[in-house]
C-alpha cells in the first residue's frame, strides 16, 4: 500500500515542474465534535496533467498517494501539489456516448479520501476544489456543496517560513466527521464499490488516469 506517516506526509516527489505547492490539512472528529486520534486518512490525487501514479508511467510508484494517521488532536497534514481536472480522451467510446447525450466528459480538480477509525463508520469521499470550471459541472455527478473546498493562496512570509517552504502556496482545509458504529462490517471499506465509484473509475481508466 501507500507509504504511511504519523500526522504529516509529503505526497509528491517534487518532479512536476508545473505543480503549485498545496498544504492540505484538517481534523478528524466524531459526531460530537471530539477529535479522533490515530484516525487513518488515506489520500490520493492526480498530478498537474491529470495523471495518477500506477496508471501514468512517467510518475514514481505511490506518487501523490499517502496514508496519514491523525495526531493526538485528530489532525492530519500533507504537502503536495494542486491537482488538475481531467477528461475522457477525445473520440473514446465514453466520449462518443456522452456527446450523443449532449454531455461532456470533464472532471474538476479533486482529491480522494478513505477515512477510518476503530468504532467508527468507514468513509469514502472526495473534495472538489472551488474555482475549477467544472466544479459544479462534474460529468460523474460527484459534486456536493459541503465537499467544495477553496484553495486559499498564502503569500505571508511568516506562514511560508513556518512550513519551511520556498514561496507562496495554496492551503486546502478539509475536516472530516465520522459516525460511531459497533457494526464491524461498517468500519471497513465495502468490498464492492458503489455504482458511482464504478463510473468514475471507468472514466479515469479510459483517460489513462484511473484513481484506484
Q: Which residues does each PLM region occupy?
A:
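Beta-strand-dominated extracellular/periplasmic modules and repeats
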Residues: 1-212
Amino acid at each position: 500500500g501507500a507509504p504511511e506517516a504519523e500526522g504529516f506526509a509529503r505526497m509528491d516527489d517534487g518532479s512536476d515542474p508545473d505543480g503549485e505547492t498545496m498544504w492540505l490539512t484538517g481534523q478528524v472528529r466524531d459526531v460530537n465534535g471530539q477529535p479522533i486520534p490515530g484516525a487513518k486518512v488515506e489520500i490520493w490525487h492526480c498530478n498537474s496533467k491529470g495523471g495518477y501514479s500506477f496508471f501514468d508511467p512517467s510518475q514514481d510508484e505511490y506518487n501523490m498517494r499517502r496514508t496519514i494517521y491523525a495526531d493526538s488532536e485528530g489532525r492530519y497534514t500533507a504537502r503536495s501539489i494542486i491537482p488538475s481536472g481531467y477528461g475522457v480522451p477525445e473520440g473514446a467510446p465514453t466520449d462518443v456516448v456522452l456527446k450523443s447525450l449532449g454531455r461532456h466528459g470533464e472532471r474538476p480538480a479533486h482529491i480522494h479520501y478513505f477515512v477510518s477509525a476503530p468504532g467508527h463508520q468507514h468513509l469514502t469521499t472526495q473534495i472538489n476544489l472551488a474555482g475549477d470550471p467544472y466544479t459544479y459541472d462534474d460529468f460523474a455527478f460527484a459534486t456536493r456543496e459541503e465537499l467544495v473546498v477553496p484553495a486559499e493562496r498564502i503569500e505571508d512570509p511568516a506562514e511560508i517560513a513556518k512550513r519551511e517552504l520556498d514561496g507562496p502556496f495554496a492551503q486546502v482545509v478539509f475536516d472530516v466527521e465520522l459516525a460511531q458504529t459497533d457494526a464491524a462490517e461498517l468500519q471497513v471499506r465495502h468490498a464492492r464499490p458503489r455504482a458511482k465509484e464504478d463510473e468514475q473509475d471507468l472514466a479515469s481508466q479510459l483517460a489513462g488516469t484511473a484513481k484506484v
